[in-house]
């Protein structure tokens, strides 16, 4: 599998002020292990991912693995957090880029961008973990708080990325409904082998774009710069 969102050889961190070469090397090794873990989740599934497979994929010794993660449960917990953070970073990066020069937040285009993100291996791994957690109590206990943290962070970042929309009385329900609906459609299309560009899917997406735009119509005349200025003034 070759995909830029998951790599067993991630870009290495550069030494920063206050950090020694050894500290940076340790962080690089940890990151490489986490990337390799996500790769293994994607390739072999959760239950077939072993620390031996991860260490081999990460090209680190068993000793290095044990230094960072003495137990598989610790590795899984860190990998789940790493997965969620990668999804959040991807979401923020792409949606900020989309709206960089926009006067008003591009709602329909934003829904399309998020939909494309749900076709990535990152979301497929998330689905793999959800299914595995149904019969794995330890994974379930790990996922539950991580999912809550993800949802809080997703909502918080959405308010920052879409300053004008965040002023709407319907902002929370609009963003939550969009995420839940798109994730549900993505799971359905993946499980049935249906194309994300099928007429069936596109018809639903068109309805969602129109519905969400309608929910946020109360702030349609407020531009992004005005909203950001108002937010800045309220903090003073």
Predicted features along the sequence, with ranges:
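Solvent-exposed, amphipathic alpha-helical segments
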Residues: 32, 36-43, 90-94, 125-129, ...
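Short, basic, alpha-helical segments at the C-terminal edge of helix-turn-helix-like DNA-binding modules
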Residues: 81-87
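Helix-turn-helix
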Residues: 32, 36-74, 78
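Hydrophobic alpha-helical connector segments
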Residues: 78, 91-121, 174-178
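Hydrophobic/aromatic-rich alpha-helical bundle segments in the mid-to-C-terminal region
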Residues: 140-144, 160-236
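Residues in soluble alpha-helical coiled-coils and helical-bundle/repeat scaffolds
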Residues: 70-74, 78, 134, 138, ...
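N-terminal intrinsically disordered/low-complexity leader segments
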Residues: 1-28, 39, 191, 217-236
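Amphipathic alpha-helical packing segments from all-alpha helical-bundle domains
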Residues: 88-89, 93, 116-127, 137-164, ...
